[in-house]
Design a protein with these regions (language model features):
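Secreted/periplasmic carbohydrate-active enzymes, especially glycoside hydrolases
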Residues: 1-10, 18-324, 328-332, 386-387, ...
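Substrate-binding/catalytic cleft of secreted carbohydrate-active enzymes
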Residues: 315-434
Length: 434
């Protein structure tokens, strides 16, 4: 008890820390191609379920943890922790070192743990507590799921695919793949990384494949840009009425063998906006929307979303970021999604004095930006997402929403950014989705 009490008292005095939080597409890696296609980690060597158990309570803080053994064979690997469904805000502590403090319990997050790990047993703790920005959660909707479900550790070689940004765009009658792969080299000197990819059509026909040798300076991330034609295939443009998906698989090669497969599906075409309307492939979307949050399991959500689509619903409006598989379902069924950051203060929304509404309290601007950033990067490669919402309908407006809008417009060049509480101001592309 004394050791944990000491840790917690020390953390109370610390400023919010999130330096090791990783903002990127949500994915994990597989040892075998077939496993990646099935999303089956049973034969992935460096993938460990994270299911911490309660250790003790110190005041209003619940300490949960798990001991994880790091064998010598993992020394050339970066170890990441994916956390979701924490229910409460948390501090992440590894071997008595603070890794990150997270106020948003609704948005899944990844963390780089390698700087804090050692060979042998490692103690990974979460200190579950009340959020220091609880006012941002007043209008949030809880997902009724098992705590920590879907959390895991996984490892990637120190030369690895760190992230990717994939698009299939139409040029005339031709579809073109635009694939940007962020490659990370955590060795001290320049290394050549072999990066492979292949792409299959919605009819399961191999269209293109290649392995590129890509030099990356030591301790840096660089971007490999791939541009290739997929042919005159406008019949495969993705929409709610034509949910055709390509299959891309990325991997690295070491010692002549493919490693660390990442597989995902991608729809062709673009989501844009004009004159206050959402567009898919240049055509206005006739909106029939429904508020929806995935509160159960994949199979139950699949059945619920199918039922909604059968009634004519074509756009879902979640209240906060959803499990990654929710977006897979929507990609596959042809359901549009307006992705929404977990910014849901519903008190004092009309009080525009500084500090009146949380959205006009500059002390919270870092938290607003962190939530928008986490929302955007993890799901930006999903075709179903046609727009981004900065927060709830009663979130208010002000300095923090201005900054959030500016940041998101700086990274997202096509899809609409919506602030439904803009109240006639400049920081929204569309007033609201009905």
């Amino acid at each position: 008890m004394k050791r944990f009490s000491t840790i917690i008292l020390a953390l109370v005095a610390c400023a919010t820390l999130s330096a090791q939080q990783v903002y990127r597409t949500e994915f994990s890696v597989f040892d075998l191609r077939e496993a990646a296609l099935r999303n089956d980690h049973s034969k992935t060597e460096r993938h460990i379920r994270f299911a911490p158990k309660t250790i003790e309570a110190v005041g209003k803080v619940e300490v949960v943890g798990q001991t994880v053994n790091m064998p010598t064979a993992w020394s050339d690997y970066n170890v990441y922790l994916h956390i979701q469904n924490t229910i409460k805000a948390y501090d992440l502590v590894v071997n008595e070192q603070l890794v990150a403090s997270v106020e948003d319990s609704y948005t899944p997050a990844d963390f780089l743990l390698s700087p804090y790990l050692r060979q042998g047993d490692n103690e990974i703790l979460l200190l579950l507590r009340r959020s220091q920005s609880i006012e941002l959660h007043n209008g949030s909707k809880s997902n009724l799921v098992e705590q920590f479900r879907g959390s895991y550790l996984f490892a990637q070689h120190r030369k690895h695919i760190f992230d990717y940004d994939a698009r299939i765009v139409e040029s005339g009658k031709t579809l073109n793949l635009e694939l940007d792969i962020a490659v990370r080299n955590d060795f001290n000197f320049e290394e050549v990384v072999q990066v492979g990819y292949d792409i299959y059509s919605p009819e399961n026909k191999l269209i293109d494949y290649a392995v590129r040798e890509f030099p990356v300076a030591g301790r840096t991330i660089d971007t490999l840009r791939i541009r290739t034609s997929l042919g005159e295939e406008s019949r495969f443009l993705w929409s709610d009425k034509n949910p055709k998906l390509y299959r891309l698989t990325l991997y690295t090669k070491r010692d002549g063998k493919p490693r660390e497969y990442i597989s995902f599906r991608l729809g062709a075409g673009t989501s844009t906006f004009a004159d206050g309307k959402l567009l898919r492939n240049g055509k206005a979307i006739t909106v029939k929307s429904a508020r929806y949050n995935a509160r159960t399991t994949y199979n139950e959500a699949l059945a619920e979303i199918k039922a909604l689509k059968a009634t004519g619903v074509n756009i879902l409006l979640p209240d906060n970021p959803q499990p990654e598989w929710f977006y897979d379902i929507c990609d596959g069924l042809g359901i549009y999604v307006v992705e929404r950051a977990n910014i849901n203060p519903d008190e004092n929304s009309t009080n525009r004095k500084i500090g009146g509404t949380p959205s006009n309290n500059p002390e919270l601007v870092g938290e607003y930006l962190a939530r928008v950033k986490a929302m955007y990067y993890r799901t930006r490669n999903h075709s179903c997402i046609v727009a981004y919402a900065l927060g709830g309908d009663a979130a208010g407006n002000g300095y923090n929403m201005y900054k959030a809008y500016q940041w998101l417009k700086g990274v997202e060049k096509q899809r609409a950014v919506i602030c439904t509480s803009a109240d006639g101001e400049w920081n929204t592309d569309i007033d609201r989705i009905e």
